[in-house]
Amino acid sequence: MSQNQIFKKFIEAGALLEGHFVLSSGLHSAKYIQCARVMMFPKISQFLCKELAKKILETFGHIDLIVSPAMGGVIVGYEVAKQLGVPAIFFERVEGQFQLRRGFEIKEQTKCIMVEDIVTTGLSSRECISAINKHSGNVIGAACLIDRSSGGANVGVELVSLAEMTIETYEESNIPSWLNDIPISKPGSRHIK
């Protein structure tokens, strides 16, 4: 499946947004990929996650568990796990730190893949992988639908994606004036209380 076919699914779902966005990383961008818009369509999400599951199998072989960070990774992780026939669990932020809740556990040396919706800087992925390691899981890789860094994000393990996209981002101190003229939207879930 080509990257253009992947992007077409996101466009069909109305998931490629334009405006002034503050990303979970704190960076500013004129474009945002709202993966939840894709995940609201079961046929599209199943199709995309089936393709991602194939890439995971080709790259990493057999795994035991899919682990995702809430919120964005929950549906993607579940659907990928369904395609692979393995369980899926997720970490939730409690006072800014990832924690396992809801009776979830990771048995020692369980072969895990961390699955996200979108990777930009890799911060959420690294935090989730660190949390898996603290629970004695064996993280053998990571996967996402879209890699916004075009391979530039370091998540600490090999990362596979369905598509890579470079979308320019700006530090708060370096926002272009044309972008500053647009009202800010904060669509991510990192700082929700």
Please describe what each predicted stretch is.
Residues 1-193:
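PRPP-associated nucleotide enzymes
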